[in-house]
Amino acid sequence: MNVLKKRWAAAAAAAAGLVLLTACGSGGSSGSSGGAVTLGFAQVGAESGWRTANTKSIQESAKAAGIELKFSDAQQKQENQISAIRSYIQQKVKVIAFSPVVESGWDTVLKEAKNANIPVILTDRAIDSPDKSLYKTFLGSDFVAEGKKAGQWLTKEFGSATGQVNIVELQGTTGSAPANDRKKGFAEVIAADPKYKIIASQTGEFTRAKGKEVMEAFLKSQPKIDVLYAHNDDMALGAIEAIEAAGKVPGKDIKIVSVDAVKDGMQALADGKINHIVECNPLLGPQLMDLVKKVAAGEQVPARIETQETEFDQASAKAALPSRQY
């Protein structure tokens, strides 16, 4: 009996370890019920307001489309996403979609999905793999273009400056597609004029708390900061707290340009604490569900689908805020 009790306890612990795998909809152990398309979605985490809006869009759109959604939160850990994807393969879902924590290290698990004849859709973030057959399509933003837009705003804003323009950069999650590409696009633009210099650059992990912490360190180590470039609004909002605590005025003493355009960021822009925001649209749910149905039916889809996005200054932020969904 003691041996049996130990086995039951081990089984219960293993089940608890999979608590991140949460079925939404009718659920169940089979890949689908009543012929419904089943989607296994491995979300990167809940690190920001953008990500929360993205998750909500996916969950609501799946319900509206009649798609059975099995959803997991990887808590920003690649190993959790890989475990979730393997679980979806075992459950024989019709389609797998995920937003990769980082760009590399996916080939093995995606080959497992391919061998199981389960199509994969990349959402929001791309992967770095020479084998493009491992996924059907990518749905999301052009992160390099977002970085370029931020750089173009900066060069226009400081075009008449005669001295060196000192820039600090809050990067996203190390190794992630948006962090790599937003940095690349921004750097390409400012490289055209040597007066623009990034004097400090560090990851803020896309979170408000880390953005504040890193900005505090920048302020202590750098006597003159002209501009903050934040890879997302949440880090910019954390940085604003640090700037104000240091007795400086965000948006004036230190100009701020960020990416996302979530509601809190837009409010800071309307209040003059952020100077410019490049939009990254999180509401991918409707487009994703359309793609899920198509690939489940064996239809051909484009290899890359980019979302339409804009930019905001203070006036346009004030106009957009009343109807902002996220």
Identify the meaning behind each predicted range.
Residues 2-7, 24-326:
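A residue-level marker of the well-folded mature domains of exported/periplasmic proteins
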Residues 19-23:
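C-terminal motif of bacterial Sec signal peptides marking the signal peptidase cleavage site
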Residues 7-16:
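Sec-dependent N-terminal signal peptides
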